[in-house]
């Protein structure tokens, strides 16, 4: 992996990992009480665990592959690494991830190369962050015994992971109706909602369908705009502004997330409220992010890695986990710029969430 010039290494500092309990400002604390569930659709074990407990002093090679550099996915990687460090100290083993980390920068050819290199490096496990990463890594380990543990796969069934015995992980499945209810609660009588997403992002497919169904049921008109690059997303955002929408919904879409810092000011200037499927959007300027605690998601992912490597489990023994979606994150700077009463906004949101957190605009969680 060390000779892959095309692969961008992390720009964030590992020093932040030890502070994961406070790293997401107020956000991480807000999500700490969220619970997880295992999927009833997960694969049942077809074989007994083949391994045994790890020996003290043992070193495991852990490949970690990030799909693209943005706040939510970076936060997951930091959390996975921090948790693996803690588990390693507890169990007296070493998880070597530093030599086997890569960021594909949303490039499929990069993902393919990373997968091939990790297999050639004979890593013990691959942690795949985001749906495209997980799908590519699963293909890469075919005909090997290298397990894949994914994180932030919104719809594992739609991604084709059901029935696959060599993959498991954690899902950030989105409660779209809850987000749509937030929009309506903040804008009584709203008659048009914009949808901004990337058609090529599998994670957006079901959420967009759910949003359309909600709008149809409630007599709300939908205006859809799409983009696959930051430049296209900027044009799509401008088109939504021109269409006169008052609120825009975006699911857990990596393409839009990567572009959020480039579009949020245009939305603010036009008085458009952006409601999204992850806290990182709010961090990058959107009015509202809704969803899981990505620190907790990363920690649970690392726990699954430990169960595979240290406890002799197989992916088939570990059904994928989903987490309660109930955390609303409000960008207070954006709310003020839009002329919204923060106290009134929180009161309107209360019936549809478990926690309300606040952030101000930044590139990454500090």
Predicted regions and their residues:
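N-terminal secretory signal peptides
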Residues: 1-11, 15-30
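Extracytoplasmic "Venus flytrap"
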Residues: 61-87, 98-109, 200-204, 253-258
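An alpha-beta-alpha
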Residues: 62, 80, 169-218, 314, ...
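Short beta-strand elements in bilobed, periplasmic/extracellular small-molecule ligand-binding domains
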Residues: 88-107, 166, 215-230
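Beta-alpha junction/loop-to-helix N-cap segments that form part of ligand/metal-binding clefts
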Residues: 99-160, 253-268, 272-274
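Hydrophobic alpha-helical segments within soluble ligand-binding/sensing domains
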Residues: 154-164, 168-192, 292-313
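Hinge/cleft segment of the Venus flytrap/periplasmic-binding protein
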Residues: 307-366
């Amino acid at each position: 992996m060390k000779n892959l010039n095309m692969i961008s290494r992390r720009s964030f500092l590992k020093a932040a990992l030890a502070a994961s309990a406070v790293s997401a400002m107020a956000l991480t604390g807000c999500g700490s009480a969220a619970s997880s569930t295992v999927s009833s659709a997960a694969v049942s074990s077809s074989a007994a665990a083949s391994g045994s407990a790890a020996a003290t002093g043992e070193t495991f090679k852990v490949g970690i592959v990030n799909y693209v550099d943005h706040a939510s996915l970076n936060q997951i990687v930091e959390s996975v690494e921090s948790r693996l460090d803690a588990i390693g100290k507890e169990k007296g083993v070493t998880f070597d991830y530093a030599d086997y980390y890569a960021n594909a920068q949303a490039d499929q050819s990069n993902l393919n190369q990373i997968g091939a290199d990790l297999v050639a490096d004979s890593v013990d496990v691959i942690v795949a962050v985001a749906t495209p990463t997980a799908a590519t890594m699963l293909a890469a380990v075919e005909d090997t015994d290298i397990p894949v543990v994914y994180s932030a796969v919104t719809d594992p069934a739609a991604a084709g992971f059901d029935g696959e015995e060599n993959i498991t992980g954690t899902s950030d499945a989105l409660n779209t109706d809850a987000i749509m209810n937030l929009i309506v609660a903040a804008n009584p009588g709203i008659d048009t909602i914009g949808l901004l997403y990337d058609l090529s992002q599998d994670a957006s497919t079901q959420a967009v369908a759910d949003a359309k169904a909600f709008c149809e049921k409630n007599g709300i008109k939908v205006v859809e705009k799409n983009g696959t690059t930051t430049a296209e997303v900027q044009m799509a955002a401008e088109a939504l502004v021109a269409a006169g929408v008052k609120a825009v919904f975006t699911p857990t879409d990596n393409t839009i997330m990567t572009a959020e810092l480039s579009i949020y000011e245009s939305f603010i200037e036009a008085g458009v409220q952006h409601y999204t499927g992850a806290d990182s959007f709010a961090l990058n300027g959107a009015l509202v992010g809704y969803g899981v605690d990505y620190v907790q998601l990363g920690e649970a992912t690392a726990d699954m890695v430990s169960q595979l490597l240290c406890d002799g489990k197989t992916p088939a023994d570990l059904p994928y986990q989903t987490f309660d979606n109930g955390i609303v994150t409000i960008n207070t700077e954006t709310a003020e710029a839009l002329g919204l009463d923060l106290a009134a906004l929180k009161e309107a949101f209360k019936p549809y969430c478990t926690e309300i957190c606040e952030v101000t605009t930044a590139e990454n969680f500090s």
